[in-house]
């Protein structure tokens, strides 16, 4: 199917669901109850067989958005960068830092390449939604516990953006920055307090090499991390890790600009442009880290 037909089909579908359907419902509700009841008894019969076609249209548009819009903005940053929608960070790589607890997730929408002599991979890590069985219990206390469990899992489990950078220099020790929103208290290393009070208020720092940690966490780098966190929105929690020869950056809660659901605003070129801006912002972290590593030789 041609690009023009895909866009036309998606636009027609969104017009019906966004404008026509609500107007029709309003008219019906203003009329007699019998008409309302009759129509809504018929709607499931009409709609149900067409759900696969709706899903197919949405999937076609998502594929078009990724293969055209996203691929274009990634190539515009650097023609040597690679965008692979079906690839992403592995579970072993993700849990290496020990910042987040283990949950089922899948990695996708990987952007990789070399920037300033540093190999990097940027991808989405999307958690698999859990199901909670009520076991038929009507006990209000058990219901409260289930709700608490859902809220706790939503708060603790990671779902967002991950950046992995491979530097030319091995780190002697391990240094981890955990956003204070992360409740994990089993992170390895001794807790370190830096001179930057504002940074200490936002992050907990753990390291087994305090000298190296202070070189890596330069004032410029700490400022860059704060700017990234602010740029992704106040709801995002940011954590990071230096280990072996790699730097890991975790943005939990970052908006997934590669996907949309049935009732979301349709993805557009502006969303792809936002991806480009976010990538450029993250790459500036590499520039700052290279400066820190040049000092720490």
Each PLM stretch: what is its role?
Residues 11-30:
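Canonical alpha-helical transmembrane segments of integral membrane proteins
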Residues 71-77, 85-141, 149-297:
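Charged, low-complexity intrinsically disordered regions
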Residues 80:
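Conserved oxyanion/phosphate-binding beta-strand-loop segments in alpha/beta enzyme cores
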């Amino acid at each position: 199917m041609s690009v023009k037909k895909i866009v036309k089909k998606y636009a027609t579908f969104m017009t019906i669901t966004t404008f026509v359907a609500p107007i029709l419902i309003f008219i019906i509700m203003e009329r007699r109850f019998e008409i309302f009841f009759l129509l809504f008894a018929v709607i499931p019969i009409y709609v149900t067989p067409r759900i696969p076609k709706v899903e197919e249209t949405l999937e076609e548009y998502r594929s078009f958005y990724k293969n055209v819009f996203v691929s274009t903005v990634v190539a515009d940053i650097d023609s040597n960068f690679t965008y692979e929608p079906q690839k992403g960070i592995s579970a072993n790589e993700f849990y290496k830092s020990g910042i987040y607890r283990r949950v089922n997730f899948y990695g996708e929408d990987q952007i990789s390449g070399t920037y300033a002599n540093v190999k990097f991979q940027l991808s989405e890590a999307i958690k698999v939604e859990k199901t909670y069985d009520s076991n038929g219990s009507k006990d209000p206390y058990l219901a409260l516990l289930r709700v608490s469990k859902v809220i706790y899992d939503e708060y603790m489990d990671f779902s967002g953006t991950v950046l992995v950078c491979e530097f030319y220099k091995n780190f002697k020790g391990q240094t981890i920055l955990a956003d204070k929103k992360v409740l994990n208290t089993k992170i390895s290393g001794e807790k370190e307090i830096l001179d930057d009070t504002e940074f200490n208020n936002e992050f907990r720092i753990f390291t087994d090499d305090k000298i190296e940690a202070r070189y890596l966490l330069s004032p410029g780098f700490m400022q860059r991390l704060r700017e990234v966190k602010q740029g992704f929105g106040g709801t995002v929690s940011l954590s990071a890790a230096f280990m072996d020869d790699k730097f890991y950056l975790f943005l939990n809660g970052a908006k997934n600009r590669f996907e949309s659901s049935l009732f979301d605003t349709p993805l557009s070129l502006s969303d792809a442009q936002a991806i480009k801006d976010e990538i450029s912002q993250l790459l500036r972290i590499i520039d700052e880290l290279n400066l820190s590593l040049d000092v720490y030789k």
